Design a protein with these regions (language model features):
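N-terminal cap/lid segment of alpha/beta-hydrolase-fold proteins
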Residues: 57-98
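Short beta-strand/loop motif that positions the catalytic acidic residue
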Residues: 265, 271-273, 277
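Alpha/beta-hydrolase active-site loop
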Residues: 155-176
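Short beta-strand element of the alpha/beta-hydrolase
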Residues: 99-109
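Hydrolase active-site cap/lid region
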Residues: 200-244
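Short amphipathic alpha-helix adjacent to the substrate-entry channel of hydrolases
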Residues: 117-138
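Short, small-residue-biased leader/transition segments that mark boundaries at the very start
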Residues: 2-9
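Short alpha-helix in the alpha/beta-hydrolase fold that links the catalytic acid
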Residues: 267, 281-292
């Protein structure tokens, strides 16, 4: 932990940048109170309350993290987005018996590694493991300028730029001529990107996990008002926009309306949203998806009862629970993905 002293009050306030949060590009401002840190987690313009206490040096228990022996092969590879000057490093996971289809996996907002790692959870590694065991291949990769990926401007990149990275990965997969179908699994912002590429007919099918279906300013206003702070309920759209000025990604996201690209998407879609998601509200987004994809064949849209933004079983759904939950991703979600893809 690296800490920077902000003042010398009796409640020492510090700015903490944790190793666990490096991949998120997030910060944490807190005070020491009764032996623990009580503060605010901030990422990509979103601010949420988060309390933290010292943990065992052995780290948290994550029982779903894949452990060998594995019935599949992992291949380290790279592909290039020439326009952005980015070389993306990733892992191709394929069952030893081969696979007919493959999914490229696209992470949520902020710089993230190929496992979409957060608080020692590795959801993309868990998903890739489960899919490979079911004969479904995956390609997951570090975001541009993150992990082993080099080049490209991540700080000022919008979802349009990151969609071009994903498109380069799709082109690489098709060039391998190993798979009959190439799909895209996107989480959160990755779901947004999935529909961008779906509208361009770049993929054969889409799995959207907590992907937004409404304009970005509505999403951020919901997040802010449901952050748990007593003052948050009174936040207005005007205040939010003024607060976010200067953050290129947030300004772009607030103005972006995904409905046009969703309506243009004609490939099969599996869209899952957790009912306790405090970042992308299920009811609001599911309603829009059902309307826009009503005529889309082989599409399944589902609210996952009791699950948060990471698709963990939870109490409140707020991000301050993520660390303490041992489950990385609900088993029923993994089963839904495998079952749906295998029926295509």
């Amino acid at each position: 932990v690296s800490a920077f002293l902000l003042n010398r009050s009796s409640d020492l306030e510090i700015l903490v940048k944790l190793d666990l949060l490096k991949s998120l590009g997030a910060t944490y401002v807190a005070c020491f109170v009764d032996g623990q840190l009580q503060g605010t987690f901030a990422q990509a313009g979103m601010k949420l309350p988060l309390n933290m206490k010292e943990i065992s040096p052995d780290g948290p228990n994550r029982p779903q993290t894949p452990k060998g022996p594995f019935p599949y092969i992992t291949e380290e590879m790279t592909f290039t987005n020439t326009k952005a000057g980015a070389t993306l490093a990733g892992t191709l996971t394929v069952h030893k018996g081969g696979a007919k289809c493959v999914m490229i996996m696209v992470t949520g907002s902020g710089p993230e590694n190929r496992d979409e790692e957060i608080y020692a959870h590795k959801p993309f590694a868990v998903i890739a493991d489960r899919l490979a065991r079911a004969g479904i291949a995956t390609l997951r990769y570090d975001d541009r300028a993150t992990g082993q990926s080099v080049g490209g401007d991540m700080k000022n990149a919008t979802s349009i730029d990151l969609a071009e990275d994903a498109a380069a990965g799709i082109e690489w997969l098709r060039a391998q001529k190993r798979f009959k179908k190439v799909g895209l699994l996107g989480h959160s912002e990755g779901g947004l990107i999935a529909f961008m590429l779906g509208a361009q007919k770049k993929v054969d099918f889409i799995v959207s996990l907590a992907g937004p279906a409404v304009k970005g300013d509505s999403i951020l206003l919901y997040q802010s008002r449901n952050s748990g702070s007593p003052l948050a309920k009174g936040i207005t759209m005007e205040y939010l926009r003024n607060m976010m000025k200067g953050n290129k990604w947030v300004e772009w996201f607030m103005d972006y309306d995904p409905t046009e690209n969703i309506a243009k998407t004609k490939c099969p879609v599996l869209a899952l949203n957790g009912t306790k998601d405090c970042q992308v509200p299920a009811a609001q987004n599911i309603l829009v998806l059902r309307r826009l994809l009503a005529k889309n064949k082989k599409t399944v849209i589902k609210e996952c009862e009791g699950l948060n933004h990471l698709f963990q079983h939870c109490n409140t759904g707020r991000p301050d629970e993520y660390y303490n939950i041992e489950e990385t991703i609900a088993e029923e979600v993994l089963a839904d993905i495998v079952g749906w893809v295998n029926k295509l």
